[in-house]
Amino acid sequence: ISISPNALRPLQKLGIKDDFVDRSFVPEKAVMHYQGKEIKRLDTEVVTSSRQKLIEVIHQSYVGLGGEILFEHEYKSLDADSCEITFTNNEVYKVSHVLACDGIKSSARQNHFPSSGVPAYSGYSAWRGIGLSEIKDIQFHFGPGTHIVNYPIDHEGRTSFVGVVKTNEATEDSWKIKGSKEAFLEDFKFYDEEIFSMVSSSEDIYKWGIYIRPSLNSMCSKNITLLGDAAHPMVPFLGQGGCMAIEDAYTFGILSGKLGCDFNKVQPLYEKIRLQRNNRIQSASMLQGKLNHIKNPIVAFTRNLLMSHTPLLAMRTEKIWNYSIDEA
């Protein structure tokens, strides 16, 4: 996962940024290539890491503040009128409010936002794994209908690699389906294998379909508020999925504190602050996917020329990264 400045600011405010950075990697550059040739080198301010490390840091802080996590509780149903949540172990809890951050397959969204659409295949499938390499920068490699991104996630050489293919052949939406290295290499046979040398040291390699849902008109229903992928699943081509979830959570928390947990007041303000930004970045991520996977060589040449000789990339990232929730 990569966390950009817009999401690092909330972590800083929560007092956990430094711990997260210490467990992660801070690359200085993002380098773009097309068919083996470098076309752009940019300064970057992101922290690259693994989801495990990010969750560890958040969990440690949460438990340290007296937070509680209920294990062996699988969600079954929610009665929004009585404010009761039922779990498959037959435990029932009465609550004042529900923050549903249960992913693209969100049961809360499906049951309580009935006209919000279902997950649909985006037209992209992705390979991922973690191996060993000596790279110190974020490395993007573009090719016809494909792209690869590699980046270090710690100081021990562990490197994340993701390869995306534009294909009409839908793959299941699961991060747990193992693929073969041979099939991965076949999908990226037009690339120099040195680009993904870390694949050979990866214990496993996974393949999954990238799915989307329609943009919402509202993130709130009665006493239920959606966050993260439950509200706005997005293709990963701007690296903002996790960042938007952090922004959502921090925004809701800050508003709840300022308004004394009066959720009737919190919800409309939360939606006013978050809905337009989330939907805009969701849409921009889809557009970036089209730019990343151009097949026509003339159009690809034009894209590369613009990337190489204009500040468009820097301007786009700055617009996303400079956002501050406290100023929203």
Briefly describe each language-model feature range.
Residues L99-A100, W127, N150, F184, ...:
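Conserved mid-domain beta->alpha element of the FAD-binding
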Residues S4-I130, N168-L185, D326-A328:
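Conserved N-terminal helical subregion
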Residues D137-T171, I177, K181, L185-F190, ...:
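Active-site substrate-recognition segment that forms the wall
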Residues S283, L287-N322, D326-A328:
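Alpha-helical membrane-targeting segments
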Residues R23, F190-D204, F263-P268:
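Acidic/histidine metal-binding catalytic segments
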Residues G66-G67, D81-S82, F142-G143, I205-P214:
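Short gly/ser/thr-rich secondary-structure transition/capping motifs
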Residues P119-Y124, K136-D137, K181-E182, E193-W208:
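A short coil-to-beta-strand element that immediately follows conserved catalytic motifs
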